[in-house]
Amino acid sequence: MVKQIRKLTIKKAKWKASDGIVYIYATLNNTIITIVDTSGRVVSWSSAGICGFRGARKASPFAAKTAAEYAARQCINKGINRAQVLVKGLGTGRHTSIRGLQDAGLKISLIRDITTTPHNGCRQPKRRRV
């Protein structure tokens, strides 16, 4: 008779942190939201493209709010209730994504803008004439 070999299963550690950091990267074409715990491990992430928006609709504020609510619901299920928000970029989904996080039930303790500004760095692209 052949003995059956047991499969070893590794249990993942549950999230112990109740605080997190939300990074919102709002570009002109998309909005990407990443939620990490205090040690820097990614808990959940979302973008307007993942929520089903394509093309120009990804750049809309409604798409940013939907993506923020999706990411916030995932991290609330894992036990993160409070978060600091770090916003980067000049896209249209900056403010509505913060509102989406609050609507999903995430308590926001701090909002900080970390958009980088050039000190006359690279040359800007040629302006479009329509």
Curated annotation (Swiss-Prot):
Molecular function as annotated in GO: rRNA binding; structural constituent of ribosome
Gene Ontology BP, a term: translation
Gene Ontology CC annotations of this record: chloroplast; ribonucleoprotein complex; ribosome
Ion transport in keyword set: no
Keyword Cytoplasm: no
Protein keywords: Chloroplast, Plastid, Ribonucleoprotein, Ribosomal protein, RNA-binding, rRNA-binding
Location in or out of the cell: Plastid, Chloroplast
Lineage: superkingdom: Eukaryota
HAMAP family noted in UniProt: Ribosomal_uS11 (MF_01310)
UniProt-listed NCBIfam families: PRK05309.1
Family in the record: Belongs to the universal ribosomal protein uS11 family.
Assembly with partners or alone: Part of the 30S ribosomal subunit.
Name assigned to this protein: Small ribosomal subunit protein uS11c
Originating species: Bigelowiella natans
